[in-house]
């Protein structure tokens, strides 16, 4: 099927030649890819006839950029000869391989990540309060301190994540997090827990952005949208294994406290996971050990054709950082993350509310399992809905606010004596998590340029963390057991205002798409479409001589503002 997968460089740069990206091969004996609409374009360059050709490109609107903007996968693609187009059967096989390997690995990591966050919550029904002598308000402070560490860790974490191999970064961070979970067993007072929760938040802070970055490297925009709920089933369902572990530990009569055993079990699983991740977590598709060289090429080609942008770049770019901060979409997503996550502490208060409703510690774990099951079903429904109705992320996110608003109002309105009704409405109110899942994927999918993408993700997580610093303080013991102030903030700010922000973002992105379509139609009419699809790069050959290379924008680390061929997913 293929002539060759990896070969010597097909477009070796000479001292006298510039190079032009074009669909087609570098020698006359190869089959012209222009005749095959779906062929994989792995040929990188073809010599210009003269420097005048390059000047013409510049006059036509081509951009001269530094060689550092070239994508990390460029060299791998440049070392490959063309491949025949994938048959439907081959593409299906490749997609399922990506789904199974990546979603299982990322899903398990995500599940352990959220179990790690919730260890303190489960410990409250396993004897933590009595052993460490803390109050409910101090418990809320510990949840706040976790997110203080979370926000502090965002800035150094994102920088390290961009400049170092992603797989090694994820493995080492996971190892550090497992050690901190183990150390919880040594805490004997409030002060010890303060330090541990802060550093746990610090170490976990960049794992979620790293996983989202990986999703963006391996899956197309459409796949990312409907796979987000599938990926997040691992988080939403984490209460099932964690709940059953906690349930079993309720029967432990050994001298070691049940909550310490819970820490040992979760920390131990995370420790072994970190070893696996260090060796097998992929930096990008070209470094994925579970893919053949041929599959790596097809994966890169599928993604860059979908996103019309690069895969990864290890150089921090100040102009992309500034552009991200100036882009109103960045601030809309950041503000939406803040407003929505003002309701996130509901997950950490549920066990305490169960106790207030006279549900035993033993039965509280089972109610938590039921809650996780409900959230899992909601995620499955959301997945099918986004698959059947693609490119409507804003409307999907808005829809899943309706159950939360309904459940929240019902919880406040029902009499406290209606225990079953209160439990049911609180479970229904938890559907806001689906909106968060959709928004997180949409946030990164609407930007290109690796530094800009990471900056936007950082800003989103800052909004997320600030809200989570505030939200535990809404649940003051003086407001127990109904906590009316907390519920009012959740219903009005988190679940009503947030969808409006998403709608505004959609309007802005739709307007940008319309302007780009008009520009593209104009360029087609003028016969100059290449000026918005390709960019020429000044670089040097192996002898140090300056050369000029015209490269498809999808192989460059351009932002969505620089790459006018990029179409925003809505």
From Swiss-Prot:
Pfam families to which the protein is assigned, alphabetical: MFS_1 (PF07690)
Location of this chain's protein in the cell: Endoplasmic reticulum; Membrane
Transmembrane segments: 96-116, 141-161, 163-183, 198-218, 229-249, 261-281, 328-348, 369-389, 397-417, 423-443, 457-477, 485-505
Gene3D superfamilies in the cross-refs: MFS general substrate transporter like domains (1.20.1250.20)
GO biological process: cysteine transmembrane transport; cysteine transport
Lipid bilayer topology: Multi-pass membrane protein
InterPro entries hit by this protein: MFS, MFS_trans_sf
GO MF term list: cysteine transmembrane transporter activity
Modified residues (Phosphoserine): 14
Region of interest (Disordered), residue spans: 1-34
Gene Ontology CC terms: endoplasmic reticulum; membrane; plasma membrane
Biased composition (Low complexity): 1-15
Name of the protein this chain belongs to: Uncharacterized transporter PB1C11.03
Species in which this protein is naturally found: Schizosaccharomyces pombe (strain 972 / ATCC 24843)
Organism lineage: Eukaryota, Fungi, Dikarya, Ascomycota, Taphrinomycotina
């Amino acid at each position: 099927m293929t002539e060759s997968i990896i070969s010597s460089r097909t477009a070796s740069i000479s001292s006298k030649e510039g190079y032009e990206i074009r669909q087609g091969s570098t020698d006359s004996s190869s089959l012209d890819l222009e005749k095959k609409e779906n062929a994989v374009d792995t040929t990188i360059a073809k010599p210009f006839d003269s420097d005048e050709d390059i000047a013409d490109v510049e006059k036509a609107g081509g951009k001269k950029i530094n060689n550092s903007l070239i994508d990390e996968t460029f060299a791998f693609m440049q070392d490959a000869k063309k491949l025949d187009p994938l048959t439907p059967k081959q593409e299906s096989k490749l997609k399922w391989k990506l789904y199974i390997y990546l979603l299982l690995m990322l899903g398990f990591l995500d599940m352990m990540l959220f179990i790690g966050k919730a260890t303190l919550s489960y410990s409250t029904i396993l004897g933590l309060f009595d052993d460490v002598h803390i109050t409910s308000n101090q418990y809320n402070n510990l949840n706040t301190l976790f997110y203080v560490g979370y926000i502090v860790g965002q800035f150094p974490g994102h920088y390290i994540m961009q400049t170092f191999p992603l797989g090694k970064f994820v493995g080492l961070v996971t190892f550090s997090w497992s050690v901190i979970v183990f150390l919880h067993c040594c805490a004997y007072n409030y002060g010890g827990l303060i330090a541990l929760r802060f550093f746990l938040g610090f170490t976990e802070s960049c794992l979620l952005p790293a996983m989202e970055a990986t999703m963006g490297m391996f899956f197309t925009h459409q796949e990312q949208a409907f796979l987000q709920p599938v990926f997040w089933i691992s988080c939403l369902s984490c209460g099932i294994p964690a709940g059953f572990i906690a349930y079993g530990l309720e029967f432990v009569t050994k001298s070691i406290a049940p909550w310490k055993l819970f820490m040992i079990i979760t920390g131990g699983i995370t420790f072994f996971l970190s070893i696996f991740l260090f060796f097998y977590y992929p930096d990008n598709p070209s470094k994925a050990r579970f893919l053949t060289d041929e599959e790596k090429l097809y994966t890169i080609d599928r993604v860059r054709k979908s996103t019309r942008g690069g895969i990864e770049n290890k150089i921090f770019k100040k102009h992309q950082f500034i552009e991200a901060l100036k882009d109103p979409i960045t601030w809309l997503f950041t503000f939406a993350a803040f407003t929505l996550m003002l309701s996130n502490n509901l997950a950490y208060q549920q066990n305490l509310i169960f106790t207030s409703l006279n549900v035993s510690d033993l039965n509280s774990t089972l109610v938590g399992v039921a809650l996780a099951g409900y959230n899992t079903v909601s995620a499955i429904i959301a997945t099918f809905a986004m698959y059947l109705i693609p490119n409507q992320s804003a409307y999907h996110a808005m829809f899943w606010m309706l159950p939360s608003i309904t459940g929240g109002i019902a919880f406040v309105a029902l009499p406290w004596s209606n225990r079953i009704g209160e439990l049911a409405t609180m479970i229904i109110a938890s559907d806001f998590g689906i909106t968060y899942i959709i928004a997180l994927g949409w946030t990164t999918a609407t930007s290109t340029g690796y530094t800009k993408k990471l900056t936007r993700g950082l800003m989103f997580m800052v909004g997320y963390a600030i809200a989570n610093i505030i939200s535990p303080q809404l649940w003051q013991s003086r407001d127990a057991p109904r906590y009316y102030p907390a519920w009012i903030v959740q219903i009005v700010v988190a679940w009503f205002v947030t969808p409006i922000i998403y709608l505004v973002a959609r309007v802005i992105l739709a307007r940008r798409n319309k302007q780009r379509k008009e520009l593209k139609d104009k360029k087609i009419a003028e016969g100059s479409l290449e000026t918005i699809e390709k960019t020429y790069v000044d670089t040097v050959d192996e002898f140090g001589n300056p050369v000029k290379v015209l490269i498809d924008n999808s192989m460059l680390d351009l932002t969505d503002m620089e790459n006018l061929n990029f179409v925003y997913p809505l």
